[in-house]
Amino acid sequence: MSSNIPQNAVEADTLSNIYTYKELSVDKLKYEYEITVSSDYIEQKINSRLQEIAKNAKFPGFRSGKMPYDLVITNYKNEALEYVINDTIDYCSSDLMKKIEVKSHIHPKVDIMSLPNLDKKDKKGDFLYKLSFESMPKVPVIDLDKINLKKVKAKIKEGDIKEFIDSIKTKFPNFVSVDDASYQAKNEDKLIIDFEGRIRNKLFQGGSGKNFTVNLGSGTFINGFEDQLIGMKKGETKSFKLRFPEDYQVISLAGQEAAFSVRVNDIQIAKDLQSDNEIARRIGFEDHSSLIDHVKEVIDNQCKEMEDLLIKKELFDCLDASYSFDLPIEVVKQEQQRVERELNAKDDSCKEAERRVKLAMLFMEFSKEHEISLTQSDIMNVIVNQYVSKDVSFDRVFKHFKSDGQFQELVRGQALEYKVTDYMIEKASKEEQIVSVKELKELFDNI
């Protein structure tokens, strides 16, 4: 049986005038055009598409490629129309941007206004759609010769080291048992207790313990429990009742009244260590000298981190103030949503988003001008330092990176920012300013 494929179909690409366009609006980076494609072109493209489909079309009772053409039309007309419309939009939109000399664009939006009615013999109507998009702005190249930065450097003194060690000592208190039998327990004392808790005279799960350590004022037990222990003496026993909170995490205990019995086995109070070496050994170091060396290193690393962030902040402020150009609205909107998620607030989110987009575009242009490219190591550093944690493994993050294009774009953007800013700071003119550790912390806190 004949396939009845028409032999006089004209290839649409041979037409000289495929579409016409009309400018609807141009506002800074935003463009809007109305594009009209003749119904003849659409019809010819559909016929060509149907011929391609017919070569391999399958239908019960016919061999592959031998399906009657009228059945091909009936079964595949809508599929062919969708294919042709999408292909036409891609071709015409791309060609239009070349004609109006838009080299790069973002977020094109297509609104189909009308489709031709190919079932009519006359007045089929043309294919009409609206194309909206934003062009990429012309981004200026950063002139490093015009950038002068203040490099803050902290000078570590003995007082800083002593203050740091004193703060560590509070985290490693030295407790000693009280010998005075008349001593009454106070807040911040450590008690060694036996206790039992019962509800309706039945011991509940987790309601008892032997030689259990309680730091008074720590809030380890339910509200009111530790208050009952204040004033008790070593060897004393006390009974009291407390009610569990209504929102207590163990549902079976929530809101229940419990009777507690407590015996104080020992009371320990904080006592200062006498020598520097005792302090060092208490914290886990061989001697005081080793502790000082460690503290110096810790403070130095903390200062370097603050110094780096301060000079980067100054560089960003300088670039933000020195360069101005139109920003793509849709890109800013997307960044604004990210800012609001990060800061959990909408105040100033638009301003911060505009700043981030501007800096990202400046960095991108600078990297092209200075041929700064990313390596695998740059990407890995961002993944490890920014996203891997004790709760999120490297394998999990890297798998997400490989499968999610948006996350890839985010990570690459961060990696490029770090590499470009390091390059700029290294090359830019810098004036060193010596400050104390306290002054450095104040500057950092005011970022």
UniProtKB/Swiss-Prot annotation:
Pfam families reported in the protein's UniProt record: FKBP_C (PF00254), Trigger_C (PF05698), Trigger_N (PF05697)
GO cellular component, as recorded: cytoplasm
GO terms for biological process, alphabetical: cell division; protein folding; protein transport
Keywords: Cell cycle, Cell division, Chaperone, Cytoplasm, Isomerase, Rotamase
Major subcellular location class: cytoplasm
InterPro entries linked: PPIase_dom_sf, PPIase_FKBP_dom, Trig_fac, Trigger_fac_C, Trigger_fac_C_sf, Trigger_fac_ribosome-bd_bac, Trigger_fac_ribosome-bd_sf, Trigger_fact/SurA_dom_sf
Protein's cellular compartments: Cytoplasm
Top-level EC class as recorded in UniProt: isomerase
Residues of the PPIase FKBP-type domain: 188-273
Top-rank taxon: Bacteria
Known catalytic reactions: [protein]-peptidylproline (omega=180) = [protein]-peptidylproline (omega=0)
GO MF terms held by the record: peptidyl-prolyl cis-trans isomerase activity
Notes concerning its domains: Consists of 3 domains; the N-terminus binds the ribosome, the middle domain has PPIase activity, while the C-terminus has intrinsic chaperone activity on its own.
Its biological purpose: Involved in protein export. Acts as a chaperone by maintaining the newly synthesized protein in an open conformation. Functions as a peptidyl-prolyl cis-trans isomerase.
Family membership: Belongs to the FKBP-type PPIase family. Tig subfamily.
Name assigned to this protein: Trigger factor
Source organism of this protein record: Wolbachia pipientis subsp. Culex pipiens (strain wPip)
